[in-house]
């Protein structure tokens, strides 16, 4: 087992890119993806164990809490958590800290990927995509150095009451919005990427075109990575510019484990 393990959930690449940038500085790191059940849950031999994930509806992405609970960590390990969102911290780190005590945690911001809610430029502070990416890369290096130094965050992650309520309402909203997932059959090239990318197997091909089920968790990888931008979720998403991390390809998100020396 590697010296470091980072458990990562990423829908459109920002969190995976951040995890990889952390790993490049930490060295000897396994990045275990949590888009579905992690392939490695026994992390007791790792010196450092981290979690990198986005904020979905004020909280953790659907199903992620169960994945986190399945991970076994040595009581001597240094544990850290990074939550990435477009604006606010959410309750993800608070929930993570209740499961695995965090020695270090940090909230970061990047471009918004929830295209049906906001355009991707809707982030705080508002900055151009290229600047946001460079800032994210520099911050990952800074955080990785703090982790290597064993820095400890004195205060526990907060729980914002508004976000706590929001995270309880979010699943119902997701079900409603997911019913609007559709494809433009005229422009769809039937490449099959969306079905392979979906962490829940929610996309099936019928007569050569994707059909969406009712088990969407709003990672939105299918929509944001569609090479012909044929997938949409209501009129707003047809008008707004699509976005995914420039350094992460769809095939990268399909991996279950990525090792970085």
Short names for language-model regions:
Residues 41-42, 129, 184-185, 211-213, ...:
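Poly-acidic low-complexity segments
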Residues 223-224, 228-261:
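Flexible mid-to-C-terminal extensions adjoining Fe-S/redox cofactors in radical SAM and related proteins
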Residues 40, 113, 206, 234, ...:
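Short secondary-structure boundary/hinge segments and terminal tails
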Residues 2-6, 12-14, 23-36, 43-53, ...:
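FMN-binding flavodoxin-like domain, especially the glycine-rich phosphate-binding loop
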Residues 17-18:
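Short alpha-helix adjacent to the SAM-binding motif of class I
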Residues 183-184, 189-217, 221-238:
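Iron-sulfur cluster-binding cysteine motifs and their immediate structural context
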């Amino acid at each position: 087992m590697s010296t470091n393990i980072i458990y990562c959930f990423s829908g459109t690449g920002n969190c995976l890119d951040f995890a990889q940038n952390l790993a490049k500085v930490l060295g000897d790191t396994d990045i275990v993806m949590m888009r579905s059940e992690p392939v490695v849950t026994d992390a007791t031999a790792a010196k450092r164990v981290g979690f990198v994930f986005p904020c979905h509806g004020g909280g953790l992405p659907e199903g992620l809490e169960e994945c986190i609970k399945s991970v076994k960590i040595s009581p001597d390990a240094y544990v850290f958590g990074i939550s990435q969102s477009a604006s606010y911290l959410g309750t993800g780190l608070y929930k993570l800290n209740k499961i695995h005590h965090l020695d270090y945690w940090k909230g970061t911001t990047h471009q918004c990927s929830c295209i049906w809610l906001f355009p991707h430029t809707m982030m705080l502070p508002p900055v151009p995509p290229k600047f946001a990416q460079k800032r994210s890369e520099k911050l990952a290096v800074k955080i990785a150095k703090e982790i290597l130094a064993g820095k400890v965050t004195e205060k526990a992650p907060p729980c914002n009451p508004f976000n706590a309520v929001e995270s309880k309402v979010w699943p119902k909203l997701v079900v409603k919005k997911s019913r609007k997932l559709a494809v433009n059959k005229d422009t769809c090239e039937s490449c099959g990427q969306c079905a392979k990318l979906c962490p829940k197997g929610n996309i099936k091909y019928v007569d050569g075109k994707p059909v969406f089920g009712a088990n969407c968790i709003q990672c939105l990888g299918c929509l944001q990575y569609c090479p012909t931008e044929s997938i949409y979720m209501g009129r707003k998403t047809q008008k707004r510019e699509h976005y995914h991390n420039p350094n992460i390809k769809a095939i990268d998100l399909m991996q279950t484990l990525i090792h970085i020396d």
